[in-house]
């Protein structure tokens, strides 16, 4: 679409905002169109993920709900992005690679569980970790060696870099990618619970990317200046559109789950956006719901191993609230509210520095 701008009547395609808008609506329409067809096919093939044996009783009714919906909304976002981005932009190409590779890891994991009807038949934790490290390196190393990406570490509400991580930045970035990917995966346990916070996080990071990629805005707001980041905003918009199409079928009561093919890809992509926009630390606030879910699991496992006692009735923490009697819809909406507030606070850091 960008290359149509060479024609005199299509010069407006040079604008990132225009191409982002097109990408959003293309992905939204693709997702809305393809998802019901996928649901019908998945039901016919009995492509549903087994329910965890210790899950709350209310989850037993979800045993026939199709999974792997992430494959559809990620594909929709990628197709829409390919129509709208510039192909000579290393940030955009690396971002698409991140989406595709982490989606493939999740898809392999999903297929193992679906085909054998066993939650433990997907990728082993060790194999999944290794695959995530390799995928992360494929996405990050080209940026590192091209010198397009700063290795300086920035913290929220402070305009200067804290220090230069140099070669250790690679290790730190891989840690961010893997942590973010798995955090969203842990959150995806209730209908729409991971979807809406992901939309909020993508929107916030998209704003940071747009501002940092614009030399005038970045200079005025004292943000890191990184030329070329604006193209990734188009992919953000496409993924938000695809997620909104998915949410139409994923909201309570869900007709389809995203599966690991969706959650691992979303988390990995959100982590990647935080890295290239220099918001690795602020990601703790941008993805606060994901952090909350992850910390609850760490506390639960750590407490049980050390003290032989559980902190929560069940982890991740959304299951704890189910166990104490909260209805699923109430948990979902309250977590959405927390995600919205945390992202508004993160956006406040743009001016407060």
Swiss-Prot record:
* One Pfam family matching this protein: Glycos_transf_4
Q: Which PANTHER family does this chain map to?
A: PHOSPHO-N-ACETYLMURAMOYL-PENTAPEPTIDE-TRANSFERASE (PTHR22926), PHOSPHO-N-ACETYLMURAMOYL-PENTAPEPTIDE-TRANSFERASE HOMOLOG (PTHR22926:SF5)
Q: Which GO terms describe its cellular component?
A: plasma membrane
Pathway assigned in UniProt: Cell wall biogenesis; peptidoglycan biosynthesis
Q: Which family does it belong to?
A: Belongs to the glycosyltransferase 4 family. MraY subfamily.
Please list every transmembrane segment annotated in the UniProt record, as residue ranges. 22-42, 65-85, 88-108, 129-149, 161-181, 192-212, 228-248, 256-276, 281-301, 330-350
Chief location bin? membrane
Q: What is this protein called?
A: Phospho-N-acetylmuramoyl-pentapeptide-transferase
Might you give the EC number(s) for this enzyme?
2.7.8.13
**Keyword annotations for this protein?**
Cell cycle, Cell division, Cell inner membrane, Cell membrane, Cell shape, Cell wall biogenesis/degradation, Magnesium, Membrane, Metal-binding, Peptidoglycan synthesis, Transferase, Transmembrane, Transmembrane helix
* Gene Ontology annotations of biological process type: cell division; cell wall organization; peptidoglycan biosynthetic process; regulation of cell shape
Q: Per its UniProt entry, which superkingdom is the organism in?
A: Bacteria
Q: Where in the cell is it found?
A: Cell inner membrane
Task: Reply yes or no: does the keyword Zinc-finger apply.
Answer: no
Top-rank EC class of the record's enzyme: transferase
As one GO molecular function, the record gives: metal ion binding
Q: Which reaction does it catalyse?
A: UDP-N-acetyl-alpha-D-muramoyl-L-alanyl-gamma-D-glutamyl-meso-2,6-diaminopimeloyl-D-alanyl-D-alanine + di-trans,octa-cis-undecaprenyl phosphate = di-trans,octa-cis-undecaprenyl diphospho-N-acetyl-alpha-D-muramoyl-L-alanyl-D-glutamyl-meso-2,6-diaminopimeloyl-D-alanyl-D-alanine + UMP
UniProt function note? Catalyzes the initial step of the lipid cycle reactions in the biosynthesis of the cell wall peptidoglycan: transfers peptidoglycan precursor phospho-MurNAc-pentapeptide from UDP-MurNAc-pentapeptide onto the lipid carrier undecaprenyl phosphate, yielding undecaprenyl-pyrophosphoryl-MurNAc-pentapeptide, known as lipid I.
| Membrane-topology descriptor | Multi-pass membrane protein
Answer whether the UniProt record assigns the keyword Cell division to this protein: yes
Name the needed cofactors. Answer: Mg(2+)
């Amino acid at each position: 679409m960008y290359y149509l701008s060479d024609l005199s009547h299509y010069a407006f395609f040079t604008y990132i905002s225009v191409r982002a808008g097109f990408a959003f609506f293309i992905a939204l329409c693709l997702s809305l169109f393809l998802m019901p067809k996928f649901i019908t096919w998945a039901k016919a093939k009995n492509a549903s993920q087994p329910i965890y044996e210790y899950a709350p009783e209310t989850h037993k009714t979800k045993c026939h709900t199709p999974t792997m919906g992430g494959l559809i909304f990620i594909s929709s976002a990628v197709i829409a992005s390919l129509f709208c981005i510039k192909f000579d932009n290393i940030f955009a190409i690396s971002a698409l690679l991140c989406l595709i590779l982490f989606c493939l890891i999740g898809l392999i994991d999903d297929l193992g569980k679906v085909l054998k009807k066993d939650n433990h038949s997907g990728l082993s934790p060790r194999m999944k970790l290794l695959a995530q490290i390799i995928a992360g390196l494929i996405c990050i190393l080209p940026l590192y060696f091209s010198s397009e990406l700063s290795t300086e570490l920035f913290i929220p509400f402070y305009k200067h870099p804290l220090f230069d991580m140099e070669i250790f930045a690679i290790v730190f970035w891989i840690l961010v990618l893997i942590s973010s990917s798995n955090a969203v995966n842990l959150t995806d346990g209730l209908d729409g619970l991971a979807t809406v916070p992901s939309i909020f996080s993508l929107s916030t990071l998209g704003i940071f990317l747009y501002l940092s990629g614009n030399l005038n805005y970045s200079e005025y707001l004292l943000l890191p200046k990184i030329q070329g980041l604006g193209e990734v905003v188009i992919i953000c918009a496409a993924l938000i559109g695809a997620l909104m199409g998915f949410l139409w079928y994923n909201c309570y009561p869900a007709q389809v789950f995203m599966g690991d093919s969706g959650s691992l890809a979303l988390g990995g992509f959100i982590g990647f956006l935080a890295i290239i926009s220099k918001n690795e630390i602020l990601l703790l606030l941008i993805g606060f719901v994901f952090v909350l879910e992850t910390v609850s699991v760490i506390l639960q496992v750590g407490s049980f191993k050390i003290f032989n006692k559980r902190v929560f009735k069940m982890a991740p923490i959304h299951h704890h609230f189910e166990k104490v009697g909260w209805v699923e819809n109430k948990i979902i909406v309250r977590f959405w509210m927390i995600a919205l507030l945390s992202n508004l606070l993160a956006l406040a850091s743009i001016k407060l520095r």
